[in-house]
């Protein structure tokens, strides 16, 4: 397990609401909460940047964090991330913000403290480019979209 440094930017975290935590021993994501000043109605088609009240510092360049949607919000209510996935670099130290987009047909109320996204730590391998004239042959080659069949 990796120790993740965190700064609490909203005093309600740790008092009214717990620090992000894993829901079960097998959970991959830590739940992030909407640390809004008041409940907010997200209209259909609207995107809103929501503070989490928390900043983190990963510190290890071999790791990054992803902010991902919560499956229930997307499936049941059409609430997904406006940027689809948020990437948190290992040297970022600012507040974690969640871009929420209502792709549904009805307005959705985001309550103060509601779990709106999840944070997942992932390994990172940094690459450098090696410029070549040609690639070694592979079975796929340059086959792109639909190369393996229609269904």
Swiss-Prot record:
Name the Pfam families on file. Answer: dUTPase
Question: One biological-process term from Gene Ontology?
Answer: dUMP biosynthetic process
Q: Where does substrate bind?
A: 70-72, 83, 87-89, 97
Q: In which pathway does it act?
A: Pyrimidine metabolism; dUMP biosynthesis; dUMP from dCTP (dUTP route): step 2/2
Q: What class of enzyme is it?
A: hydrolase
Which cofactors, if any, are listed as required? Mg(2+)
Catalysis performed (reactions): dUTP + H2O = dUMP + diphosphate + H(+)
**UniProt keyword terms in alphabetical order:** Hydrolase, Magnesium, Metal-binding, Nucleotide metabolism
Listed InterPro entries? dUTPase (IPR008181), dUTPase-like (IPR029054), dUTPase-like_sf (IPR036157), dUTPase_trimeric (IPR033704)
GO MF terms listed in the record are:
dUTP diphosphatase activity; magnesium ion binding
What are its E.C. numbers? 3.6.1.23
- Protein family membership: Belongs to the dUTPase family.
Q: What does this protein do?
A: This enzyme is involved in nucleotide metabolism: it produces dUMP, the immediate precursor of thymidine nucleotides and it decreases the intracellular concentration of dUTP so that uracil cannot be incorporated into DNA.
Q: PANTHER family this protein is in?
A: DEOXYURIDINE 5'-TRIPHOSPHATE NUCLEOTIDOHYDROLASE (PTHR11241:SF0)
Name of protein? Deoxyuridine 5'-triphosphate nucleotidohydrolase
Q: What gene codes for this chain? A: dut
């Amino acid at each position: 397990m990796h120790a993740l440094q965190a700064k609490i930017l909203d005093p309600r975290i740790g008092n009214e609401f717990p620090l992000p935590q894993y829901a079960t021993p097998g959970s991959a994501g830590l739940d992030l909460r909407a640390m809004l000043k008041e409940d907010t109605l997200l209209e259909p088609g609207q995107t809103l940047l929501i503070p989490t009240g928390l900043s983190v510092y990963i510190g290890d360049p071999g790791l990054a964090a992803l902010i991902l949607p919560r499956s229930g919000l997307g499936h049941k209510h059409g609430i997904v991330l406006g940027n689809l996935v948020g990437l948190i670099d290992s040297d970022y130290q600012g507040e974690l913000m969640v871009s929420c987009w209502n792709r549904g047909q009805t307005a959705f109320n985001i309550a103060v403290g509601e779990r709106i996204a999840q944070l997942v730590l992932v390994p990172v391998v940094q690459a450098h480019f090696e410029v070549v004239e040609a690639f070694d042959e592979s079975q796929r080659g340059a086959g792109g979209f639909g190369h393996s069949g229609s269904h």
